[in-house]
């Protein structure tokens, strides 16, 4: 896979670029870009490094230094101390093909050695921009393969989660009158309320992790990166899911915040004591 690292900056830097700035592309991609985000932050990256590990999404000092140096070529003076988080992602880059075939990008189609399995691999630039069209193309392939009956009562829209930060005063007052939880701000950086978090959990295919809450509501995406709101989000998740706070995870397996033995209600209490451990 090809690994790319990004840096995300605080919203106070969002006005340093009015639109996406690309550098001259290379064989590895479009290079380091500088772009404002739809939420007002500034984003720089990615690097492009071929690695062997399929789960190698760690961030590195070398990657950060490379992004900082190359982003400065497009926008000088981006303050390093305004970086609020860094992250990395992987792209399934095609490096080897069967004998007689050359490497390519945008490999989309039914695998020759696995009938019914559709490959969508080698998504090079502009893979993100063409993702909606790719999805429609693959959907048509599946329809052709399976010949399914069209669901006549299918509803293609769903009610979104209210965004209190972007709502008008009248809309906020109405929501709070209906449910006071919309007036209880949990994430102060992004002004996300308890009502929004509850909606994210209770909706079909609701959130079960703090990252799930983050993706649905932006709670934890602000300057403090969940340093303030995370304990309360864990508490709300545990209460709604009917589990101990020690079972709540950030994302995947092994990402629990609390050690076993720190039961519900212990998040704000004194550190758990191992059996037989004396108080100092």
Task: Briefly describe each language-model feature range.
Residues 3, 23-39, 50-185, 192-205, ...:
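C-terminal catalytic lobe of FAD-dependent flavoproteins
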Residues 13-18:
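Short helix-loop capping/hinge motifs at secondary-structure junctions, enriched
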Residues 55, 193-204, 227-245:
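Iron-sulfur (Fe-S) cluster-binding segments and ferredoxin-like electron-carrier domains
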Residues 187-189, 224, 229:
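Short cysteine clusters
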Residues 229-238, 265-280:
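Short flanking/linker segments adjacent to small metal-binding domains or redox-active Cys/His motifs
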Residues 242-274:
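Low-complexity, small/polar and acidic-rich linker and loop segments
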């Amino acid at each position: 896979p090809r690994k790319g690292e990004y840096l995300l900056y605080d919203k106070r830097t969002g006005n340093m670029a009015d639109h996406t700035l690309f550098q001259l592309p290379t064989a590895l991609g479009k290079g380091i870009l500088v772009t404002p985000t739809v939420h007002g932050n500034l984003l720089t990256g990615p690097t492009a490094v071929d690695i062997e590990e399929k789960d190698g999404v760690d961030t590195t000092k070398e990657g950060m230094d490379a992004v900082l140096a190359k982003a400065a070529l497009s926008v000088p003076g981006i303050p390093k101390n305004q970086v609020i988080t860094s992250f990395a992602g992987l792209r399934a880059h095609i490096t080897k093909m069967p004998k007689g075939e050359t490497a390519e990008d945008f490999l989309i189609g039914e695998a020759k050695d696995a009938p019914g399995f559709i490959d969508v691999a080698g998504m090079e630039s502009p893979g993100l921009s063409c993702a909606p069209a790719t999805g429609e193309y693959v959907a048509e392939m599946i329809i052709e393969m399976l010949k399914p009956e069209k669901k006549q009562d299918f509803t293609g829209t769903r009610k979104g989660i209210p965004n209190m930060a972007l709502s008008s005063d009248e809309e906020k007052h109405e929501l709070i009158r209906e449910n006071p939880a919309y007036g209880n701000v949990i994430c102060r950086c992004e002004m996300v309320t308890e009502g929004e978090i509850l909606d994210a959990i209770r909706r079909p295919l609701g959130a079960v992790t703090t990252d799930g809450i983050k993706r649905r509501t932006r709670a934890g995406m602000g300057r403090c990166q969940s340093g303030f709101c995370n304990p309360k989000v864990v508490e709300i998740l545990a209460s709604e899911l009917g589990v101990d706070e020690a079972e709540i995870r950030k994302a995947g397996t092994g990402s629990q915040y609390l050690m076993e033995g720190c039961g519900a209600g212990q998040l704000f209490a004194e550190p758990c004591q191992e059996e037989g451990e004396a108080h100092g």
